[in-house]
Amino acid sequence: MKKILVRVLLVLLVAALGFGGFVYYMVHNSTSQIYSYNKKTNKSSDDKTASKKSVAYLLLGTDTGELGRSYKGRTDTMIVVVVNPKSKTTTMVSVPRDTKVDFDDVTIKINAAYSYGSSDTAMSAVEKLLNIKLDGYLLVNMKGLEQLVDAVGGVTVTSPLSFNYEGKSFVKGQSYDLSGSDALKFSRMRYDDPQGDYGRQMRQQQILTAVIGKLKSNPTTVLSQKFLDAVGKNVRTDVSLGSVKNLATEYRDAGNTIKSDQLHGTGQNIDGQDYEVMSDSEITRVHNLLQNAIDAK
């Protein structure tokens, strides 16, 4: 998902699936270069993971080449992920990139919040929209998806529709073993999908779930230099190493069940811009879904 995890899959894999203190030790060098201190979220995430409580992170996907460049771009992928160790469930909810929100008294698409400020700004926009509390973010570079999928040896997915994209063909109902390059094609196509960006979000979640499954079946993959290099170049997070350690040792069963959903809006053109406008009832539905995922026992 655009950058599909890895620290995301090393927080949300180590988070949701966990590989123990050994992995925590082995990935220290990689995670230290992708970590950004945030006083507010660090305390929240550290306190909750130490107490084995549910945590909610925001996955952000940008598409600007390796992270660290001056041009930040927009976060066309935004996914709220709740990891609950008690219910042994991970819940993912995608937020459409064109979602209409107010930012400093100006109407913008939610994917622009990151470019106007930072990952913290994007996180604040999602918190305000859904009336939830997030415990940290994981920012992944879209191009990194290709490297990450290759690092785990490829993934297998079943196509929900038939389409062609950049020379690769997919047939509805057929399963495909995808390389990183093909996984990127599978997750990027939008205009030929009858569901538009919603369809793309679901395919992104398919790739994410497949990567998680691959790492869970072969956790030693996370120790490979290829995998760690992909993480270092393409992932940034404010989730501390302390939280990662807690997630790795106490949250592994949360990957047993992965649930996916989306925030659905209505397309509207406002002042020449196309937005997805969310109804109060839809925002309430998703808020309740996420809150129930957090509170589930």
Where are these regions (language model features)?
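Non-catalytic, solvent-exposed segments at the cell envelope interface
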Residues: K2-L10, A15-K297
